[in-house]
Amino acid sequence: MGFKKASLIAFIGLATLSLAACRKEAGQAHQSAKVGIIQYAEHSALDAAREGFIEALAEGGFKEGKTLTVTTRNAQGDQANLQTMVEQLAGKNDLNFAIATPAAQALLNGDQETPAVFTAVTDPVSAGLVDSLAKPGGNMTGSIDATDVAGQIDLLTKALPQAKTVGIFYNSSEVNSEVQAKAAKKALEKKDLKVLVKTVTTTNDVQQVMTSLANQVDAVYLPTDNTVASTASTIGDILKEAKVPSMGSDDAYLSAVLFTSGVDYKAIGKQAGKEAVAILKGKSPATIKVAKPEKAKIAVNDDMAKALGMDSQAIKALGK
């Protein structure tokens, strides 16, 4: 065998081994991991989701400071920050984790190579994140915070039978909020109730728009919404002064409303964390079903109930 021919065969052999090694690397189980987290906003629900995610990783053998390195970025509710933050994480981790729809969309647009998991997303199909809940089909899966909106409206009308006009308030630029708001409007109209919808696109408009809404309705429904969560104190003060009872889909803003009925964000964060563990151990995101919330929980703001002259125990009883 000639030297050139032998060299060529050796080169092909090495190239084949190299490609095989790359394929193995892409699907092999990690003994330790680097994980990037991009969180859309700073509020208790999203913080709880992040905590649940980290907990699940630890339970799966990836403990921060030992076998897990975490890099976290928080956009503070400003979508303009997301692209830069995604660029800081892209290609530098074994897996990325997005908390809330805007963060997940930015991550998918900016890094399609790194496996990713999301949570606190209401409708990942409409948001363009996955092909379907059963078969995500790409390099991303996660857990959703979709709630039974029709069930929430049933609860609202039982708790507030005197309400004839119900307001809905949310940030129209958030896909998840839009989905819930439309479902709530439909459910309320089926009950022959008048519906008044008011929206904002930034936190700067919350006080003015919410004040206007509170003066025109008998009750308010707040879907899962990052802007609502981050301005809960302002919203609560307005509703209390106007003596308008309200229901929220997220206990992150329980302080602003009479009661909430929604998902446990730490629990859905933990669901996403379990999926992340499976991916880090070699499973493809494309084949991991998007996880759904296991059970809604009801919480009542006793201080708000007292301020409105309502019986908090009677509302709590509706959830049993």
Where are these regions (language model features)?
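An alpha-beta-alpha
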Residues: F53, T141-L188, K289-M304
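C-terminal motif of bacterial Sec signal peptides marking the signal peptidase cleavage site
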Residues: L17-A21
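Bacterial signal peptide processing site
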Residues: R23-E25
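Hinge/cleft segment of the Venus flytrap/periplasmic-binding protein
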Residues: A278-K320
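Structural motif
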Residues: T69-A90, T199-L213
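Extracytoplasmic "Venus flytrap"
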Residues: S32-G60, T71-A80, S173, T227-S230
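Hydrophobic alpha-helical segments within soluble ligand-binding/sensing domains
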Residues: P124-A163, V263-K283
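Beta-alpha junction/loop-to-helix N-cap segments that form part of ligand/metal-binding clefts
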Residues: A75-D131, D225-K240, V244-G248
